[in-house]
Amino acid sequence: MHTKNLFYSRPQQITQYLSAFLMMVILTRTSISSAYPLFAQQGYENPREATGRIVCANCHLANKPVNIEVPQVILPDTVFEAVVQIPYDLQLKQVLSNGKKGGLNVGAVLILPEGFELAPPDRISPELKEKIGKLYFQSYRPNIKNIFVVGPVPGQKYKKITFPILSPNPATNRRAHFLKYPIYVGGNRGRGQIYPDGSKSNNTVFNATASGRVKKIIRNEKGGYEIIIKDGSDSNEVVNLLPPGLEPLVSEGDSIKLDQPLTSNPNVGGFGQDVAEVVLQDPSRVQVLLFFFASIILAQIFLVLKKKQFEKVQLTKINL
């Protein structure tokens, strides 16, 4: 949920309270209707920054592990699996946008090398379709065929996400070459802490916006709190709004400092990224390599036979 910190003097209290209430209602509806990874799609042309950082980390502040597994070597025009694992404790519950507790969702963004793309349905085997399940993969941009997003989906069911990938064929694609390619992935579990506009969700710590003494803590009927801080220097009052799902750590009469945490950290999720490398191998090189190995094996066999023949001749001479 989006929140605002309001500063006001006593004659303005009624107007400021009404404005704050309307703002919370409007922004709450917005946060519920929006979902990751749409935030990244709407705000960034490319999900991977020049530094290598995936932009999802701008909203998901906690660092958690993510792993991707791909074959070491693949052939041209071949369908292979890219398996993304997003591990977490299935017993964990997160704070939802309405303030209630619920299970964690997961999401991922897969950045393939240029020329690699999602395999068409008619190229996916029944076994691979079973691994994919009912997942829906969406292009990051309509004109981009090598970057895909998935989610949010229930983490209980999709801790492991399987992407069906089609490798390019350098014979028909001039931009593809027989090289080693990196594949990047970013994955998150749980909701983010920051919205793209910079405002906080209700899944993070809220800090005091002023020093002073807690004059009053008001519990709102629809959830959340209003913490009124009286500034000791000029007797102004500052209202800090806590969205639904968060409980204050302070009590009335407490002295607090600027940026002191007013709540605990409710976040149990996090974001991580990983990279894997895959070699697009030329089939002719494989054939040459197989021929080379076969030649070595045949040479070894001939040497063994020649040795046995020589030993047999020597044994015959000895017997004579």
UniProtKB/Swiss-Prot annotation:
The keyword Ion transport does not apply. Component of the cytochrome b6-f complex, which mediates electron transfer between photosystem II (PSII) and photosystem I (PSI), cyclic electron flow around PSI, and state transitions. InterPro entries: Cyt-f_TM, Cyt_f, Cyt_f_lg_dom, Cyt_f_lg_dom_sf, Rudment_hybrid_motif. PROSITE patterns: CYTF (PS51010). The lineage of its organism: Eukaryota, Viridiplantae, Streptophyta, Embryophyta, Tracheophyta. The chain crosses the membrane at residues 286-306. Belongs to the cytochrome f family. It comes from Cuscuta obtusiflora (Peruvian dodder). The gene is petA. This is Cytochrome f. Pfam families: Apocytochr_F_C, Apocytochr_F_N. Binds 1 heme group covalently.
